Amino acid sequence: MKLIPKLLCVLVFCCLAPMSLAQNINWRGTIASYDGKVLGITLRDGQSVWIDLPEGLPISATERFSMEDVKLGMVLGVTTVNRADGTKVAIDVRPISPTAPQGLSAYDLQPQSTMTNAVLEATVLSSDTHEFVLNYKTGSVKVLVPKGTPMSRAVPGSRADLVLGQSVYVASRRNDANGYTAVRIQVGKNGVHPTQ
């Protein structure tokens, strides 16, 4: 029975429809404080934010993921930006659950970036860059994945992983007090940082 919360943690974190991402307010930074109920984050621009953590909120830790782990038929979440010629270039690659809703939508990792949840149908290596062919229910997209593109994998974690100074990604919603309540958390671990 102890495995159930851990499995739910990964499924809740990974099975996100791209549409739902647009409804969240995402925060990226390092943990500045944590009292068991409220997480303080120093954001990348130096500002601070405090986020309520509801009881029972699953925590995901971060595990290393590399091109050697990528397999055809795997469902990936790939964040991209467009070059001037329209070519899509990956800035983040992560495996997600096979049951995750597939599609493409805007994402806030970088200005004008998009996220695609899709099945990897083909990959071609040219020099030090891979080209992914990603298929989802209503379309297909080709993405260049240069060597060194950030990659990571979400794995079950716990509140014990919420240590000061650790990198963290939090998806939140506005609450009735005009503050923020976390709906997902992924925290760095063993030197591996969230890439989304």
Located regions from the model:
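Short, flexible, surface-exposed loop segments at domain boundaries
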Residues: 2-5, 20-56, 60-196
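Sec-dependent signal peptide hydrophobic core
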Residues: 5-12
